[in-house]
Amino acid sequence: QLIRASIEKPVYKEKLRLRAYGTPELSDNVFVEIKKKYDGIVNKRRTSMTLQEAYDFLDDDICPDNHEGRINRQVLKKIDYFKNFYHLQPKVYLSYDRFAYFEKDDGDFRITFDKNITTRREDVRLEHGSYGKKLLPDGKYLMEVKISGAVPLWFTKIISGLNVYPVSFSKYGTEYKQYVLTNYTSLMYKGENICLNQSLHQHQRIQSALASQC
């Protein structure tokens, strides 16, 4: 329901994710996070706990111990309400290698390059590492500009000179579209409610064009 709503490009959208840096062990700290986007502005509320505590909390509603004061209880309550309201279950694993760059004089301006964007719908546990289906063709990177205010003039001149223009891209949205296109017949047979709109047809054409160029 959430991802179907997200790819319709609403003014407001939100999602819940369990996030780790690298391949974690069950005793390693991870982040449980609600990511919200309103009118292009992103807001993240997250709290830290061990991976095992995160599984216990998300799967069995067992609240983690806060004896070290590392857990934001207010955020935890919001996450608990969110997951129970939508009856959320883990559906998609997604990983990528990220290169992040910051402007020397303005830490608010950041550019990231993601490669090896990998997804799977089976065995989505984080401790099992990164393997699965590649979201983009080999050699392709996803570049993202992250800034709360105006983009610096020097950077605008560079991307304009290279004829680079912004486009909308969602890792989870793209995974969902590829999943539907690959499994459309079986999903319809099962009677699942899927989203097959103009943007999905457009996505299919773009992917076909990319494949033919490689």
What are these regions (language model features)?
Residues 1-214:
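Phosphate-end processing signature that detects enzymes handling 5′-triphosphorylated RNA
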